[in-house]
């Protein structure tokens, strides 16, 4: 049976791995997951990520980041989902925790943070909130 929401699965794997203080987490890879991991790395929420080939399938391995024994990511919440897509225009993109967190947005110009989407002047699908 195929997975109905692979992005939610990715976020859940990251949350679960951080609860048990894992240094890294592996999952099936896709272009969108790589783009999300790239945004998380650019914003400093994860150490690094790598795509490897395992048994003919691409696998995304994310290195998790901790500060003083606590996970850097405190909140990782899926917003738009297959049953209810959430789209926002450039003026309506939400501020996460008054700018302390980021919203990851899928735009026509690629996956980016809420700040970059506002600066670029594009809206799109709000994938998740990270704080």
Swiss-Prot record:
An individual GO BP term: translation
Record-annotated disulphide pairs: none
InterPro entries attached to this UniProt entry: Ribosomal_uS8, Ribosomal_uS8_CS, Ribosomal_uS8_sf
Keywords associated with the record: Ribonucleoprotein, Ribosomal protein, RNA-binding, rRNA-binding
Keyword field contains Membrane: no
Cellular component GO terms, alphabetical: ribonucleoprotein complex; ribosome
Keyword Flavoprotein listed: no
Family, per entry: Belongs to the universal ribosomal protein uS8 family.
Name of the protein in its database record: Small ribosomal subunit protein uS8
